[in-house]
């Protein structure tokens, strides 16, 4: 490729490790460095530029969410998507899902894993929880980001790869959640993590509904959730990723808790990003 490629992915099957927040954080950091960054993620067909006004059921919830932070493309062929982004003026391309085993050679490979879940037995499915064996996957990356509490980070200290400990934190929006009666619903990799975040913010979670990752927000489902929230006298609340799947008429009635990646130290990542342009 004629421009630097940053591949971001996870060895863990099933999602929920924090790849999307990492992609957003890297895109924001590159933008702060005055670089025109585009994001490419897997989708159907030829490369398509995503507008924030697109519908999630047509383009996917994660591409639609990322498009709020950087120009975003979907493509069945990630290499074609990267070329389309470069042709459109990208100075650097982040490939969401570019690890492991991508056909696109990356200038910087970033693995993202849950510090709590770890790598299990380190073996690939069906013998273990990973897409490919741990050591093979680590060999494809330049840096490993482990997301989770500090008490869970020590298990990764002996790995032969530069590592950045990080956590997901709610974005400070000025909303005071203390004592707020909420009905929470989430269709993400680990919905329980969202419910725990609300508890940590001081909200009173009087009802909750865990949905499947990327689950369709059908009228019947939303009617049921709204009815349950009303019966409990609670405010409906969900994640950023789920919010983009809501119909426009419902969005004003549902509060959203954005979360952002917070590394313990940005320095090593900033250095690696800067090297892409030297």
Q: Which residues are covered by each model-predicted region?
A:
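Redox- and metal-dependent alpha/beta enzyme cores, enriched for Fe-S-associated oxidoreductases
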Residues: 170-219, 271-274
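A short, acidic, amphipathic alpha-helical segment used as a generic capping/interface helix at domain edges
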Residues: 216-234, 241-242
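Walker A (P-loop) phosphate-binding motif
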Residues: 1-54
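Conserved beta-strand/loop subsegment of P-loop NTPase cores
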Residues: 110-113, 138-148, 157-185, 205-210, ...
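Short, flexible loop segments at boundaries between secondary-structure elements
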Residues: 212-213, 253-278
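Short, charged, surface-exposed secondary-structure boundary motifs
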Residues: 119-130, 173-176, 216-219, 263-272
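Short, acidic/turn-prone active-site loops that include or flank metal/cofactor-
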Residues: 115-119, 168-170, 210-216, 258-264
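Phosphate/Mg2+-binding loops and adjacent switch elements
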Residues: 35, 43-159
């Amino acid at each position: 490729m004629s421009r630097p490629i940053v591949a971001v992915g996870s060895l863990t099957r099933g999602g929920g490790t924090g790849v999307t927040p990492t992609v957003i954080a890297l895109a924001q950091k590159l933008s702060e460095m005055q670089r025109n960054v585009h994001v490419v993620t897997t989708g159907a067909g030829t490369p398509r530029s995503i507008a924030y006004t697109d519908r999630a059921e047509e383009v996917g919830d994660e591409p639609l969410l990322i498009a709020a932070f950087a120009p975003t493309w979907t493509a069945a062929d990630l290499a074609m998507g990267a070329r389309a982004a470069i042709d459109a003026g990208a100075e650097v391309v982040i490939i969401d899902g570019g690890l492991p085993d991508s056909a696109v050679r990356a200038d910087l490979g970033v693995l993202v894993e849950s510090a709590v879940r770890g790598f299990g037995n380190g073996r690939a499915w069906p013998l273990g929880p990973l897409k490919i064996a741990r050591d093979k996957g680590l060999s494809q990356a330049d840096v490993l980001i482990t997301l989770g509490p500090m008490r869970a980070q020590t298990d990764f200290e002996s790995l032969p790869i530069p590592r950045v400990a990080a956590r997901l934190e709610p974005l400070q929006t000025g909303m005071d959640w203390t004592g707020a009666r909420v009905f929470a619903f989430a269709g993400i990799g680990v919905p329980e993590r969202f419910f725990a975040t609300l508890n940590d913010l001081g909200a009173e979670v009087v009802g909750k509904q865990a949905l499947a990752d990327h689950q369709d927000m059908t009228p019947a489902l939303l009617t049921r959730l709204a009815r349950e929230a009303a019966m409990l006298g609670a405010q409906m609340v969900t994640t950023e990723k789920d919010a983009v799947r809501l119909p426009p008429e419902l969005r004003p009635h549902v509060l959203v808790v954005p979360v952002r990646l917070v590394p313990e130290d940005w320095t090593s990542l900033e250095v690696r990003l800067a090297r892409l342009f030297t």
